[in-house]
């Protein structure tokens, strides 16, 4: 059985295939389609030869608390049911989380943030994102969302970004 890790970015979708011990076996990327359904179809088609057990994807922007609907400004996606699109296109279980949160979890498991009690991870790509570790746990807002470091209000009386 193989596992997948998908990073949906503003310009490309990065794919990783892992064994059950989470060793990276193969990686590649493809340009990100503009339409969400086309992105889901591309992901399903790219993973099909590997017979993966499920799809795990990180995507930029904000997800609702159930991780079913995403709004990503840099993709021009608003209220996109990405997890459902991935399940429909692939026939597999699919989970979508914020890409900064996904990067934080990966670094905490097997990267530079192993055994770290407090830390910040910053991701720079088409957008700005990241994650925060507090007391050895990934911090989420009271609504369950990952921090959106690229959406920080810079003026005290400014509009939410």
Which ranges hold each PLM region?
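Glycine-rich phosphate-binding loop and adjoining helix at the ATP-binding site
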Residues: 31-44, 53-55, 63-118
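Glycine-rich, phosphate-binding/catalytic loops in enzymes
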Residues: 22, 73-75, 138
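A generic "binding-loop/recognition-motif" signal
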Residues: 11, 100-101, 145
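Active-site glycine-centered loops adjacent to acidic/histidine catalytic or metal-binding residues
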Residues: 7, 99, 125
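Short glycine-rich anion-binding loops that position phosphate/pyrophosphate groups of nucleotides
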Residues: 11, 60-63, 125-127
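A cytosolic small-molecule/anion-sensing beta-strand core signal
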Residues: 19, 59, 65, 134-135
